[in-house]
Design a protein with these regions (language model features):
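Cyclic nucleotide-binding regulatory module and flanking cytosolic helices
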Residues: 1-32, 76, 81-85
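Glycine- and acidic-residue-biased ligand/ion/polar-headgroup-sensing regions
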Residues: 33, 44-57, 72-75
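Short phosphate-coordinating micro-motif centered on Lys-Gly-acidic
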Residues: 36-41
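Short alpha-helix-to-loop micro-motif enriched in aromatics/charged/Gly
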Residues: 61-68
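Cyclic-nucleotide recognition modules
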Residues: 70-126
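Short helix-to-loop capping/linker segments positioned immediately adjacent to catalytic or ligand/cofactor-binding
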Residues: 91-92, 111-115, 134-144, 161-165
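N-terminal positioning helix adjacent to the helix-turn-helix/winged-helix DNA-binding module
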Residues: 143, 147-150, 154
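Phosphate-/nucleic-acid-contacting segments
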Residues: 156-176
Length: 176
C-alpha cells in the first residue's frame, strides 16, 4: 500500500513531485481514541486516510463538543495542516473514531507542493470548499432544526456508520 493509491491527484503530479511525496509522506497506524491534532498550535500536517475513521470536532470552553465532519478511506484532512493557510484562525481537533491507517504529509512539504503545482492548489481549494459546505450544513442543523429531528438524524447516521439496524444505548444497567 502506497500513498499513490490514496492521494487522488497523485497521477497529476510531475514525476519529481511524486518521488518527493513518496519520500516525505509518513505512514502511521493510530488506535481508536487517539487525538491526532489538538488545536494546540502544533501543525500536524495533511492527513491522507487509508482506512478507518477520523472525526473533526471543536470543543467549547465549557468542554462541550460538536462534530464538524467525519473522514473515511481516501479522504484528506486539511485542517490538521491549517498553519499553511494563514487565514484559518480556529482550533479543530482530529480524533480517531476507529483504528486508522493514514499518511501524514508534512505541512512545509505540502505548502511547497501547492506553490509549485496549480493542480495541488486547485485540489486544496476544492477540499476547503467541501469542508466549508459540511460546516454550513451543520450550522443549519444546529440553528434551524428541532432537537428531535437532529437526534433522529444522528441515530440514523450512527446506525449507518456502525453498519447496524439498531444502536446500543446502554451496554450495562446500573445496580441500585
Amino acid at each position: 500500500m502506497t500513498i499513490s493509491q490514496y492521494f487522488p491527484i497523485y497521477d497529476q503530479l510531475d514525476k519529481a513531485d511524486q518521488e518527493r511525496l513518496d519520500y516525505a509522506a509518513v505512514k502511521r497506524r493510530v488506535p481508536k481514541g487517539t487525538l491526532l491534532h489538538g488545536g494546540d498550535g502544533v501543525c500536524t500536517g495533511l492527513l491522507v486516510i487509508a482506512s478507518g475513521q477520523l472525526r473533526a470536532h471543536m470543543i467549547s470552553e465549557e468542554g462541550r463538543e460538536i462534530t464538524l465532519y467525519r473522514l473515511f478511506e481516501r479522504d484528506i484532512c486539511l485542517f490538521s495542516a491549517s498553519c499553511i493557510m494563514s487565514s484559518l484562525q480556529f482550533d479543530v481537533f482530529i480524533s480517531a473514531e476507529k483504528d486508522t491507517e493514514l499518511w501524514i504529509i508534512p505541512p512545509d512539504f505540502y505548502k511547497g507542493l501547492m506553490e509549485r503545482s496549480a493542480v495541488v492548489a486547485n485540489y486544496t481549494s476544492q477540499i476547503m470548499a467541501s469542508r466549508f459546505t459540511d460546516v454550513m450544513w451543520l450550522m443549519d442543523q444546529v440553528m434551524w432544526k428541532s432537537f428531535d429531528k437532529r437526534l433522529a438524524g444522528f441515530l440514523l447516521e450512527e446506525s449507518v456508520l456502525e453498519g447496524s439496524v439498531g444502536i446500543a444505548l446502554l451496554t450495562t444497567f446500573p445496580k441500585y
